[in-house]
Amino acid sequence: MGDPEVLLEVYEVIRNRIEERPEGSYVAELTEDDDTKPAINKICEKIIEESGELILAAKDGDREGVVYESTDLIFHVLVLLAYLGIEIGEVFDEFERRRK
């Protein structure tokens, strides 16, 4: 099984890309308002898209697809959290609260 710490590492990279806005960064582009739509809309649309792809993979019994699309969905949720200034630790705290 992989190391769950990778979520923290990915979250930090996302935060850095939002703050530093390096040219050519997918995260920087996704989290920037443009002429056609606000960043929050772009992020939420990606989450909807990835959710749908995950559902279809699950419905089709595509185990590899479920893993792939779950990763895409989790990544975009991490982008949303970072964009909104929500620390990933807040989500971990909520999981712990619900576990009790």
From Swiss-Prot:
SUPFAM superfamilies noted in UniProt: all-alpha NTP pyrophosphatases
Localization per Swiss-Prot or TrEMBL: Cytoplasm
Main location: cytoplasm
Functional pathway: Amino-acid biosynthesis; L-histidine biosynthesis; L-histidine from 5-phospho-alpha-D-ribose 1-diphosphate: step 2/9
A Pfam family per the record: PRA-PH
GO BP of this protein: L-histidine biosynthetic process
Recorded GO CC terms: cytoplasm
The keyword Nucleotide-binding is assigned to this record: yes
Residues in the signal sequence: none
Keywords, in A-Z order: Amino-acid biosynthesis, ATP-binding, Cytoplasm, Histidine biosynthesis, Hydrolase, Nucleotide-binding
Family of this protein: Belongs to the PRA-PH family.
PANTHER family assigned to the protein according to its UniProt record, in alphabetical order: HISTIDINE BIOSYNTHESIS BIFUNCTIONAL PROTEIN, HISTIDINE BIOSYNTHESIS BIFUNCTIONAL PROTEIN HIS7
Protein name: Phosphoribosyl-ATP pyrophosphatase
